[in-house]
A protein has these predicted regions:
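Nucleic-acid endo/exonuclease domains
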Residues: 1-146
Length: 146
């Protein structure tokens, strides 16, 4: 019986993540997909896995829908890990936060000091100087009993 040796490609959670990965494959040394875990505290210790990690240490989160629970989670992570540079790439940055909302995803990001982009990672983000993240897990600095 013949065996086939083929490279196993990562399993993308969406077509949009696959598009971003293809873009990064061209413009980065290595595509780091879900390679980092960030510990954060809610009512318990939780771990968040961002989508992509750039060579310069910038964390990219790709989003189709940006629901209230994700927004709250990212505000908490930013509060607990101010040293991390988390940025969003939306399929539609002009989408409203919820039905009837006056603000959209991009406005929410601006209000809360997150950088965001529409569909494509800007080349400026790839060229920015930064500090690469070498750890696989970023822990909360001060652990408390929950």
């Amino acid at each position: 019986m013949a065996r086939f040796n083929r490279k196993v490609m990562p399993h993308w959670r969406s077509g949009f993540e696959e598009e971003v990965a293809a873009f990064l494959k061209i413009h980065q040394n290595k595509v780091r997909y879900e390679k980092l875990k960030i510990e954060w505290i809610d009512l318990a210790y939780r771990k968040y896995t961002p989508d992509f990690l750039l060579d310069n240490g910038i964390i990219i989160e790709t989003k189709g829908r940006f629901v209230a629970s994700d927004r709250r989670k990212h505000l908490e992570i930013k509060r607990q890990h101010p040293e991390l540079d988390i940025r969003f790439v939306f399929t539609n940055s002009n989408a409203k936060l919820y039905k009837g909302s006056k603000s959209n995803y991009e406005q929410w990001c601006n209000k809360h000091n997150f950088k965001s982009a529409h569909r494509v990672i800007p080349m400026e983000w790839l060229k920015e100087r930064g500090k690469p993240i070498k750890d696989k897990i970023v822990y909360v600095k001060k652990r408390v009993k929950v």
